[in-house]
């Protein structure tokens, strides 16, 4: 069905997303067709990064939530002000490692309030060269919000404690964005 829709829409719709060793699932949470980041998009990015950073049974402290929010907002400001910067997780990681580190040092944020080195260490597997560097650094400029038919095949990752929660969050974000943004369009 996906192939049929994909062919009939000349590649515009009928998106089939699955995980295979030689063709793993890849997204870019920092990409939007419009280049705009509303509150909902910002919150979904924060939730995604928080899921990567903290275990299910490990609640973030308020100071950590504030620091993460500051990092995401500052990075989004950077990529929206400078269109030459390619938005992706690698760029976010480098921004936190270099620029945001300086910003929180200037603000005198204590390490016990936000351990930036621990944060970067936990996120390193998703950064360039890490085990999951493919997952959040897709070079395809694909915003799923405007796609009319998408199939996510999860069988191959159903037992993966790293991939499944991330892919599930991206599916949820896509669904919620479609429900809220696409006014007057029938959704099924």
Segments predicted by a language model, with ranges:
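P-loop NTPase motor domains
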Residues: 1-13, 17-188
